[in-house]
Amino acid sequence: MRLRYDLLFLGFLLLNISLAIFGEKCYNLRKLFGENMKYIYQNPDWHNFRWHGEKIQKLLLDIKKAQGYLLGKMDVLGFDVKNNALLQVLTENIIKSSEIEGQILDKHIVRSSIARRLGIDIGGETPVSRDVEGVVEMMLDATQNYADKMTKERLIGWHAALFPTGYSGMYKIKVGQYRDDELGPMQVVSGSIGQEKVHYQAPNADILEKEMSDLIDYINKQDDIDYLIKAGIVHLWFVALHPFDDGNGRIARALTDMLLTRSDDTQYRFYSMSAQIQKNRNSYYDILEKTQKGSMDITDWLVWFLENLLIAIQSSEETTNTVLHKAEFWQKYSTTIFNERQVKVLNRFMDNFEGNLTTAKWAKMCNCSQDTATLDIKDLIEKEIFVKVGSGRSTHYKFKNKI
């Protein structure tokens, strides 16, 4: 009997010694394996991302091959053609990245803002939008200055550019600084009021300074990890931290573009990862939620990320073909005289113009009268560039020959 009590006492003593020495680790393990474990950053080996190399390797090889083919194809083209391809891809990237978050930007304002900053002449003037200017600044810094060191100040500058008024919609937010938990924890929630579903809860604000410092160090670190994999890791890591009151998704995708540009090692962007993510928006959120609630094995996330990156590169054929067709058009009509309005509309018409071109749309695009629009269009018909289709209210115009 005495022996049993001695053994119980010894076991109790060893348990308390273990808790005293390894208390934090034991607590973390309970969170890992017990009911309290919910999110990836609660893993005791948080930051030590793992993946199965054999599942990733073939994807990397396929992507490298597709990258090489695309860059080789574009490299032989002239300066103006490459600039127009860059303009088109950056425009799509910015629009689609914002669209993922439910924000719809005017394509022509975005395009005009990028063109102005890159010194590309697209003809005509387009009004400036404060919302557009900020996101364009961020994307151009990420892709044109891709080799620059990432710093807290640079990242905070991106955030400030996204929210120049200090408001997100009607709500005042903390701009140019990491979030706090003054109004409660940062959560990703869906559903109507009273029926909300919490998909994810980010780490407490009091650890963000250290966590973001670790992430920034990782971005800048020179190591053997392929930039394609690093882009996927940084995307996940940043979204997991959700360091700002708003704009986290757009900044995560800007960081992704920066690292993909490092992989390509050129300022020219000929494919849009954000456009591909937008196409698969539901599965994007699903895989993020699953990964954010899992272990440090992020193989499934990286497979999803790399598969969609490969599709994005392969899908760039449509974009590059549009640019090439435009170049061929302007080369063919290099000696033809066009006024500024005609140049503006012709360029827009060749950029996947939505709907039919009418005199009313022409007048609106060029801020001119319908009589002037009619004369402009009539001139293009006489030059055998446009043909008239339909009659009455259904009258519209299209290219005489396929572009």
Task: Cite the ranges covered by each PLM segment.
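FIC/Doc superfamily catalytic core
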Residues: 2-403
